[in-house]
Amino acid sequence: VYAVFDNHKFGDYNAYIYKSKNKGFTWQKISNNLPENTLLWRIAQDHINSNLLFLGTEFGVYFTNDGGKEWTKLNAGMPNISVRDIAIQKRENDLVLGTFGRGIYILDDYSALRTFNKIDKNSKLFSPRDSYWYKQKRILGGSKKASQGDNYFVADNPPFGVEFTYYLKDKILSKKKSREKEEKKFEKENKIIEIPDWKILESEKKEINPAIWIFIYSNNNIIRKVKADNKKGFNRINWDLSSESKSIISSKNFNKDESGYMVNPGEYSAQLLSLIHI
């Protein structure tokens, strides 16, 4: 059982959140590392992992997946505003936030947060939720509203296809970036920085930039390669349910990420890979 209180009408802006393991006979305060002077408004518990909690505060939303021992703020795309209400859409694993004066925010498929504290690897690809297979409608031969003008308002649909969530402990750096990072560290520590010889510089010049890819498989055969972002932390990328392009490789399309026909409905596997020049 969890309970959230506020006492701001008496000039007390501290965070009050309590947990009971014996149906309310005794209570334990679990505000722990929450910032000072942070009013709390709402708490919601995940329907699968009972230790995963979401906390609406006066300054954004926090989550914990260890029952309140440590709280982490959700920042990406979420402004520093008052979150007054929280709802969980169980079928889609979506987190819905009602704010004071700034509308509604939705975090699509938060299921990756259930195992966030268990990540001990340099990277991890999380299982996506099932996707819908359909052909997107093209109005007047174009996308969205085509040429119907600004008076015809339409909002963006969610990205089409399968949405992958993956985690990178650190951004993969090139040899040059790694060397420059090490040199900056030495400079701060007042250590001697050695000038790289021409072989090192030549190797850096010829190096292929590191890249992150997601390979899609069907019956152990690669049917599509999706280029992903090389960024630290949680990232998301979509596969549009298409196969690799069957076009003949030429100088015009060599660097283009062209797609082929749409794959059949079924089960597919995916693998997160990094391209590094050794």
Which residues fall in each region the model found?
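Glycine-centered tight-turn motifs at strand-turn-strand junctions
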Residues: 222-259
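A short tyrosine-centered beta-strand micro-motif
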Residues: 235, 266-270
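Beta-propeller blade termini and top-face loops
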Residues: 1-152, 159-161, 169-171
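Conserved aromatic beta-strand anchor motif in extracellular beta-sandwich/beta-rich domains
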Residues: 216-218
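Conserved small/polar residues in nucleotide/adenosyl-binding loops
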Residues: 277-278
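Conserved structural position at the C-terminal beta-strand
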Residues: 272-274
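Contiguous beta-strand segments within globular domains
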Residues: 142-211, 236
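Surface-exposed, short loops/turns at beta-strand junctions within beta-sandwich domains
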Residues: 261-264
